[in-house]
Amino acid sequence: MRYLVQERIFSFTADFWIEDENGDRVFFVDGRAMSLRETFELRDASGAIRVIIRKKLFALRDTMDIEDGDGVIATVRPAFFSPIRHRYEVTLADGSRLEATGNFADKDWELTSDGRLVGRISRQWFRIRDTYGVEVGPGEDDALIIAIAVCIDRIHEDEERKRHEQRPFGGGFGQF
């Protein structure tokens, strides 16, 4: 199944809908970015919370947890330095791992488990600004894969913002 994620980057609340390939609204991301701890709720079309995404406050690397009613089901973080390409790792509650590799700035990457494709994220399927597609592999948990995509997108944006802020004079003309 393929989903359309259209973020409202400049929205005060960071809320946005996720549509299926038929254009039906199937998930709603309720962003609580203004809270002390960045939190998102992924709700289904009826309003029921499927998962909650929380940014960890105290972690060496930017880290987000995905929780359901029973607790943390996945933890998403950047992989340690990889000279070949950017990577993110996802640790599931049962200890298994997923790996995300690709071009995160262009939103064109894959999510694999032991070499098996479980999800693909691509901006190339759509020509709408701030929009990308999430394709979920057969038999995979749609809400979990979408939540992982939201986490990686958010962590990557935070990393890019921090990198920009670390440049001399913030990357701009500076203050004189």
Q: What are these language model-derived features?
A:
Residues 1-176:
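Intrinsically disordered, low-complexity proline/glycine-rich segments
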